[in-house]
Amino acid sequence: MKINFMIMISLFAGSMVSAQDSLNTISGKPKFIAFSPSKATKNVNGMLIKYYDEIDQEIQPKKVNGVGLGFNGLGIFFPVLFLVNITSINNWGINDIGSEPLPDKMNTINGMQLSIVNMEPTVTNGLELSLSSNISAPSVINGVAVSPLYNFHHTTKGVAVSTFANVSQKCRGIQVALINVCKDSRGIQIGFWNKNEKRKMPLINWNFKNKKL
């Protein structure tokens, strides 16, 4: 009798949890911990765990108020390729990075993005800590971006700090790295070699004037 009663309680509890998950999915209620890719993940107030990235055409935009964690294993190989090709850095097509227009569908993270690599278009409002930055993903940082290797963004508003390179289409703030590149800049570049729309200079470069049409 007791066993039957416990089984009934367990089944009832399981059905309640399942029903609650279904309601959350239907209502779009924010989740505290969510995983991606998942059709059920749209709004997160807490932590998003992303185990691989969706391609641009398939991305389902997600809004995260909290922390976004990216564990895409492909990011481990980019540092290796970087180190192998470090001697040919002058031949890199870094001027093309970030030249794509921002897509209509983008993730939004209000808080912190911590990842091995990000390959989904993302707007980060806060802190971005990444090993291999944003690859094949036009992204925006409003705040601070830090990487032990390089930062690649479409738009940087704030501070970008890395060891080797910061590359952006549009910059409003400060870039600090061995090499800094920005096509539309309002701010300061500090590094061994710096390039903006007006000039190329070692050590320090700047521009505070609007681009002439």
Language-model features, listed with the residues they occupy:
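Surface-exposed, glycine- and small/polar-enriched segments that build interaction surfaces at terminal
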Residues: 20-213
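Bacterial Sec-dependent N-terminal signal peptides
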Residues: 1-23
